[in-house]
């Protein structure tokens, strides 16, 4: 049996808002370590990987490994019935047909009970290799979201160039060109505003802005975001949470770097 309680419905809502337009149906894999999800988007261009560790729940119980196949839009609709401050308890039997959600108000004067039908999803697990990335950029999540939105008004592709001068986001479109360059700096008054760049060699890659803009829907989950890049491998965009992470992997566009 699974029983896992979020202290606030807001976290689960934010997680679903970040991934539900990339992935329609997915397995939530529950085991001793916590609840994880790994799924590709329908175009097989982006991969989503999420983990909420068991210590992110209070209480957490999972007697055996369970895969909960869920339509994310259906789950999101049910979660709209919860107030952001509500406690949310997820429950499932060992061979479940439904995921039970119980919403409890802060004052414990309201309890709502919902069941979401589960699906049988045949999903292969992709081994994500551990890569020593050539460039790692950690920056304010809101800044990354702003850059992505701004450049998306001009083009559908962005070239990210990480070098010792800094990291440059540039694009070319029908109505003109645009670029933003960030340089490493430490903000002593607010560490969350610092920009950290770790580099072993320069990297230049081009990506779909539509997907990057989609990833930035995770901005409410974390104040910081980390971009990890190496030539010819997918970009890793990671949002770290208190008890886990949300990671997005995006394959680079081939043969477009020269056009930029």
UniProtKB/Swiss-Prot annotation:
CDD domains: PCNA
Gene3D superfamilies: DNA Polymerase III, subunit A, domain 2
Gene Ontology biological-process annotations: DNA repair-dependent chromatin remodeling; DNA strand elongation involved in mitotic DNA replication; error-free translesion synthesis; error-prone translesion synthesis; leading strand elongation; mismatch repair; mitotic DNA replication lagging strand elongation; mitotic DNA replication leading strand elongation
Annotated localization: Nucleus
Keywords in alphabetical order: DNA damage, DNA repair, DNA replication, DNA-binding, Isopeptide bond, Nucleus, Ubl conjugation
Glycyl lysine isopeptide (Lys-Gly) (interchain with G-Cter in SUMO) cross-link, chain position(s): 164
Post-translational modification: Monoubiquitinated on Lys-164 by the rhp6/rhp18 complex upon DNA damage, and then polyubiquitinated through 'Lys-63'-linkage by ubc13/mms2. Ubiquitination contributes to efficient DNA replication in the absence of DNA damage.
GO cellular component entries: chromatin; cytosol; nuclear replication fork; nucleoplasm; nucleus; PCNA complex; site of double-strand break
DNA-binding region extent: 61-80
Pfam families per UniProt: PCNA_C (PF02747), PCNA_N (PF00705)
Covalent link (Glycyl lysine isopeptide (Lys-Gly) (interchain with G-Cter in ubiquitin)) residue numbers: 164
Result, substituting residue 2 to V: Reduces capacity in enhancing the processivity of DNA polymerase delta but shows no deficiency in stimulation of the ATPase activity of replication factor C
Outcome of swapping residue 64 to A: Reduces capacity in enhancing the processivity of DNA polymerase delta but shows no deficiency in stimulation of the ATPase activity of replication factor C
Principal subcellular localisation of the protein: nucleus
Domain of life: Eukaryota
GO terms assigned for molecular function: DNA binding; DNA polymerase processivity factor activity
Family matches, as PANTHER family: PROLIFERATING CELL NUCLEAR ANTIGEN
Family, as annotated: Belongs to the PCNA family.
HAMAP family: DNApol_clamp_arch
Function statement: This protein is an auxiliary protein of DNA polymerase delta and is involved in the control of eukaryotic DNA replication by increasing the polymerase's processibility during elongation of the leading strand. Involved in DNA repair.
Subunit structure: Homotrimer. Interacts with pcf1/CAF-1 subunit A (via PIP motif); the interaction is direct. Interacts with cdc24. Interacts with rfc1. Interacts with rtf2.
NCBIfam families assigned to the protein according to its UniProt record, in alphabetical order: pcna
Record protein name field: Proliferating cell nuclear antigen
């Amino acid at each position: 049996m699974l029983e896992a309680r979020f202290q606030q419905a807001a976290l689960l809502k934010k997680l679903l808002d970040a991934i539900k337009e990339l992935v329609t149906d997915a397995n939530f894999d529950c085991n001793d370590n916590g609840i994880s999800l790994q799924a590709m988007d329908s175009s097989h261009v982006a991969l989503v990987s999420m983990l909420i560790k068991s210590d992110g729940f209070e209480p957490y119980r999972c007697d055996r490994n369970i895969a909960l196949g869920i339509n994310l839009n259906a789950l999101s609709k049910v979660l709209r019935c919860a107030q952001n401050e509500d406690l949310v308890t997820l429950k499932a039997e060992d061979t479940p047909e439904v995921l039970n959600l119980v919403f409890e108000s802060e004052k414990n004067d309201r309890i709502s009970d919902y069941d979401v039908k589960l699906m049988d999803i045949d999903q292969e697990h992709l081994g994500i290799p551990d890569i020593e990335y050539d460039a790692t950029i950690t920056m304010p999540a809101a800044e990354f979201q702003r850059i992505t939105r701004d450049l998306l008004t001009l083009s559908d592709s962005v070239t990210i160039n990480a070098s010792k001068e800094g990291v440059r986001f540039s694009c070319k479109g029908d109505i003109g060109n645009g670029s933003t360059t960030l340089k490493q700096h430490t903000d002593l008054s607010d560490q969350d505003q610092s920009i950290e760049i770790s580099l072993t060699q320069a990297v230049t890659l081009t990506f779909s802005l539509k997907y990057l803009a989609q990833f930035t829907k995770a901005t409410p989950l974390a104040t910081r975001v980390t971009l990890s890049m190496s030539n010819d491998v997918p970009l890793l965009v990671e949002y770290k949470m208190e008890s886990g992470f949300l990671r997005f992997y995006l394959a680079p566009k081939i043969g477009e770097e020269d056009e930029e």
